[in-house]
Amino acid sequence: MRVLVTGGSGYIGSHTCVQLLQNGHDVIILDNLCNSKRSVLPVIERLGGKHPTFFEGDIRNEALMTEILHDHAIDTVIHFAGLKAVGESVQKPLEYYDNNVNGTLRLISAMRAANVKNFIFSSSATVYGDQPKIPYVESFPTGTPQSPYGKSKLMVEQILTDLQKAQPDWSIALLRYFNPVGAHPSGDMGEDPQGIPNNLMPYIAQVAVGRRDSLAIFGNDYPTEDGTGVRDYIHVMDLADGHVVAMEKLANKPGVHIYNLGAGVGNSVLDVVNAFSKACGKPVNYHFAPRREGDLPAYWADASKADRELNWRVTRTLDEMAQDTWHWQSRHPQGYPD
């Protein structure tokens, strides 16, 4: 298939592009490089074994989107492009709604103009809000996300659901990720956050490699086994494979298809720290800090629907997530070159 991957040079997007190329698909990447670097493109080509076409541009540029979709006879769009820092979204809500909601609207309008009807959306477990039961199941009603980031993901899910109701020949997949971590096993591709990392694993990696002094663990008094927050961590390669499978199985299959992509088990912050210490062969400096407002004690996915319907399940362990992250970070302590 010919696939347009928005945000394809970002963390999850780049790993997914490699897996798409390895599976024989033609990949067209669109990215504005606001949170990624052009130097990842030759890495995608080398690891994928095939050349991806690249456009530097913004999903809010509807004319450009329409032109790309039409000129490249795109079959499917996988939509990663968007802003994703929960904390920053509280400070900059309008930027998040403009990028994530308005940007998706412009992209969908371009797809309608180009008659492209297969869409895979990079959603998030944040759409569940605070649920009374764990694990989270797709049939749960969506909650009230705490942050503008989470709200923007939920708004887009609602927009896409309404669109599919009005245009029943569309196939829309809403893939709800839990906590993507890890890196390509080659050690040449991984998460390269701009500025201070917002996510746990890249922060730990930067502490281990000497770029940061110590990891702040927010809260050690949660009602969990060791007092730290529990989350569902999924290896980015398993997540990338999930996109390929969803794209191949759901293409031209009308409907709204919702799947949790998670490991289906919870690990605490200290579990992750300990796995990383084992991977890098030295203790990782950390200190406890007060809880962050809005953080939940524990949640993880029920991913059995993806197993049942897509024949997808995770194959990589927390130890492998830590090992692959350390392999990437130790080989590339400053991330990708500018």
Question: Positions of the model-derived regions?
Answer:
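N-terminal Rossmann-like NAD(P)+-binding domain of SDR-like oxidoreductases, especially those catalyzing
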Residues: 1-183
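Generic alpha-helical secondary structure signal
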Residues: 39-42, 50, 63, 198, ...
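A short, structure-level motif marking secondary-structure boundaries and short turns
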Residues: 1-2, 91-93, 144-145, 189-190, ...
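Pocket-edge positions in alpha/beta enzyme catalytic cores
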Residues: 57, 69, 96, 144, ...
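Short-chain dehydrogenase/reductase
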Residues: 97, 146-154, 190, 194-198, ...
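Short, flexible, glycine-rich and Lys/Arg-enriched loop motifs at helix boundaries
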Residues: 38, 168, 178-199, 210-231
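C-terminal substrate-binding subdomain of Rossmann-fold SDR/epimerase-dehydratase oxidoreductases
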Residues: 200-338
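Short, electropositive, low-hydrophobicity segments enriched in small/polar residues
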Residues: 11-17, 40, 61, 86, ...
